[in-house]
């Protein structure tokens, strides 16, 4: 009888530990942030126009050709994908769930289609990689755009400035 009680208690304890472990795993998965990365541009531009946003009457090209390196002559779409893949690897290593809008250069995706990917996966952050060009060699640095003033990833200083 003691042996049966001991086995039952062991089974209850084991099931409790399994349930606790499963709950912790579910909780960890629930907290995992989703980051969507869009490597800007692609092999071929799409010059047909589309609205710049939902309900907008203002239109622009679906995807432009992008810049090229002034020394390397590397097209922006190639550089953007290289950078995006490195960022993907780093974010995955840090525990984020990463969705890539594109993983190759020869795609046909408009800017609206790219945004729909971020919406589909309910992205916590949508990162669009670009390597902008300028007409002057004195222009240097990075450009970061956080389009909404209520964007929780913006710093207080950026909110004040926008």
Walk through the language-model features, giving the residues of each.
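A generic local structural motif
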Residues: 15, 22-23, 112-115
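Active-site-proximal loop motif in hydrolases
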Residues: 33-34, 39-83
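Membrane-proximal envelope biogenesis segments
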Residues: 13, 28, 34-36
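Sec-dependent signal peptide cleavage junction
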Residues: 17-31
